[in-house]
From Swiss-Prot:
This is C-phycoerythrin beta chain. (2R,3E)-phycoerythrobilin 3 binds at C166. (2R,3E)-phycoerythrobilin 1 binds at C49, C60. PANTHER family: C-PHYCOCYANIN BETA SUBUNIT, PHYCOBILISOME 32.1 KDA LINKER POLYPEPTIDE, PHYCOCYANIN-ASSOCIATED, ROD 2-RELATED. The keyword DNA repair does not apply. Light-harvesting photosynthetic bile pigment-protein from the phycobiliprotein complex. Keywords: Antenna complex, Bile pigment, Chromophore, Electron transport, Membrane, Methylation, Photosynthesis, Phycobilisome, Thylakoid, Transport.
Amino acid sequence: MPLDAFSRAVVTADASTSVVSDINALKAFVASGNRRLDAVNAIASNASCAVSDAIAGIVCENQGLIQAGGNLYPNRRFAACLRDTEIILRYVTYALLAGDSSVLDDRALNGLKETYSALGVPTTSTIRAVQILKAIAVAHIQGTNTEARAGAKYRKNETPLVEDRCASIAAEAAGYFDRVIAALS
């Protein structure tokens, strides 16, 4: 079962029959709380568009995916791809909020490559969709996504993240997407 930073500190201390000693790590986690919430909000507020843009991106790069015999044909396969991409994004946000990848690893990535292989889902297209999703999410966290880039789909964040404060959160989010890519490779 995935543990948040506090539960992990208590379990670790209990296992060594000592008091919680990693107070500095807990302080740092608490201090990053608002940044995490802002980052997750930036992703969640744009999730639907991010998912559809990631899938549209792989279709633009490979029109064969939506042709008869392609992996996004017929519509039920396309819908399943959108659903799976949304699930991946959702678990990345859970990991980002918790500051821990175990929920992502345990609930989304464990056996993902094998499942996709058994279903005949091309991992190269899936990896490319996750790469696009990563770029979109990081742009929203950093506030570098603009109306000019996103067009009518653009949703401005209510609370823009301060550039120097969001670099570590953006890097952490990118790392969770990289875990997804590694699990599919």
